[in-house]
Amino acid sequence: LPAHARDTLTLGLIPAEDQRAIMTEAQPLIDRLEPALGMDVKAFVATDYNGVIEAMRAKKLDVAFFGPFSYVLAAQLAGAEAFAIAPLGKAGASYKSIIIARKDRGIRTVADLKGRTFAFVDPSSTSGHLFPKAGLLKAGFDPDTHFGRVIFSGGHDASAIAVQHGKVDAAAIADGLLDVAIERGAVKKDEVTVVWTSEAIPGAPFAMRRDLPPELKKRIAAAFATLKDVPWGKQVMPRFEPVTDNAYDVVRDTARLLNLDLKKMK
């Protein structure tokens, strides 16, 4: 049976951080969403970003909280439709990608990254792969050949910790998630430095399956619109603003710049 026939909404979450942490962070949203919807909400965290896209494509998810790039992929591959965004933290409805390094590694500029070990987050991560890769290329640095070694850590928190513990020389992560790692004591603020910062990136959207019944889609959008001041980890989602697919065209343009064929990103 489709999820809506069971009076249960399935909500997918990308594993931007440790899976347990994501589930804990999402619980207050689920607790508020259930009475607003008049439905049970069941959360699902995949082991990687593409797992959430695949689950939506298989119609196992009704709604998902994507990153901007994983949303663009899901829109093309899984019929996802962005409908809401929560302004988080200082930047509001946008955020930035940063490249961080340990201060004692002598990395001050992008050029200093040559020959170094580097961590991206996930191939489908916006601030942990797509935007920093494009930014490096614009700065004349080829991430495919200029690094000594590249790993995908699986999470922004894992990348920050890898830099802190000297497992890699530098890493690309979301600016807000560096703040979270510092607050949790996983990273010492005075031991890391920011080497590069991206332009503003449109924030992470909540998206629903385009082929859901129209009444259910209206019900979902209306429920999110009523939510205020929802805790998310140490931050608060003050409200949910409507967003449309074209807000993510800048992400599509960046993918094109890297010659990433979205059809092959599976």
Residue spans for each PLM region:
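An extracytoplasmic/periplasmic, membrane-proximal ligand-sensing/linker region
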Residues: 6-28, 201-203, 207-266
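Flexible hinge/capping segments at coil-to-helix
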Residues: 101-122
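Short helices/loops that flank or line small-molecule/ion binding pockets
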Residues: 50-64, 77-78, 111, 155-176
